[in-house]
Amino acid sequence: MANKDFLKIIKKQRSKSKKKKFQGTLLEYLDIIQEDPSTVQLAHRRLYDVINNKGCKTVDIDDDGYRGIFNGDKIRTYDYFKEEFFGMELIINKLMRYMKSAALKGEESRQVLLLMGPVGAGKSALTEHVKRALELAEPAYHLDGCPIREEPLHLIPRSLRPEFEKILGVKIEGDLCPICRHRLINDFNGEYEKFPVKQSSFSQRGRRGIATVPPMDANSQDVSVLIGTEDISKLDLYPEDDPRVLSLNGAFNVGNRGIVEFVEVFKNEIEFLHTMLTATQEKRVPSPGKNDMIYFDGVILSHCNESEWNRFKGEHTNEAIHDTVVQLKTTYCLELDQEIKIYQKILKRSDFKAHIAPHTIKVASMFSIMSRVKKSGKCDVLTKMKIYNGEEVIEKGRVKNIDINDLREEHRE
């Protein structure tokens, strides 16, 4: 009986995973776009939509002490983050403002988002959560057999693009990669309407649309990690400038139309990061060997510690890369109620079964926060913690009025 139950579960999952995905030609894909122009999305728009569509709301600052915490600023909370991150509302709001501007093709779409802050402030966890969001997105349409899963509309000749854009109601950006251009000419006689198009989902493990670049020392750094390599076994068969020798398996190739993450980005030699300049400002990356530049559409996320950032920006020779970076500072949680939720989340996911005495978590949270804030000339540390938590501080029967912004500016915690 148990075997039948397991088999039923397996078959149910398999039927879901084998949901029919589109396979057709460019002509059929054009019909789909005509019915729904939102099918065509750039990377920032796709990522912003999948997070925003999970639900969001504007916090009522008159409730629950939010007016004290946020000083009357309008704050939006996003359902996608609310069960994972606590006390990071301001940081997440800045992240989503960046994403929205980039989705609308603002200057942010040509910049690198850098999460910078102390160890344990949630930089890596936030980046991982954003990457997981992309795996929830609808499968993307792309050229069948293309190593960088590029947008099928790249097949449209530039001379015809204004006419197609008017009919379809979308903007066509980008050019064919060298491999697909070679296939179009040699396999399809230039008849781009017959080029096959398919759908596939985003997957970090499958290296489809999500790439991660770990920090490397000077001896092991190789630009091929970013832009791919030439297949040496094919150099005996084809000339060096033949697209068929290309193996486009670098991070910018894998992360095209998705996300490229740089882990501890400034632990790398600065020369290794020069590809970022063309990837952001020109939306192109070099191809291996002697081929043309390759169009790149992707969200570049990176993170580092504060000391590494200070060392990087202190070097005047790094100005070019510095100008392409949007810095988002992550900080430790300074709100008592949110710190308690963090501890409760950790305990809930652990295997600890020991009884915890009443108020233990609250006292531990108070200790953590008071160890993070600095002494102020306006109040003691305990009072400061209460103000950061949005509480009214009553002293000698009167409410003690201390501006939270004055406390923040005093030491810039």
Stretch-by-stretch model annotation:
Residues M1-T58, G117-G120:
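N-terminal accessory segments that target, anchor, or regulate ATP-driven/P-loop NTPase machines
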Residues P37-E413:
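Conserved ASCE/P-loop NTPase catalytic core
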